[in-house]
């Protein structure tokens, strides 16, 4: 419903909560997902999350878009961050106030994945078979 109304900030929070739920009770209680938990997430659920983001953002957002952009920059995360608006002039975008929560955001801007713990979580999501098949090429 939040995606339908283009309430992207709340949709992003719900996406994060759902990823924790998919990872299991321990992740829910801890409040974040370890990259090693992604491989056990049901592909159908990740695929659904990706499809919903793509549909309700007019094709602009979603994990498969992020994977496509990452591939286009030679799989270099340091080049991905500025392209999707998570980093500008070498400075990380502050959450949530400095993120763009509208269709004016760069392609791949959402959903957000916590980068405080490095790139492993995002990399695991983008390499999950259900996401990889959506952009027709494994990373």
Model-identified regions with their sequence ranges:
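Surface-exposed peri-terminal alpha-helical interaction modules
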Residues: 1-139
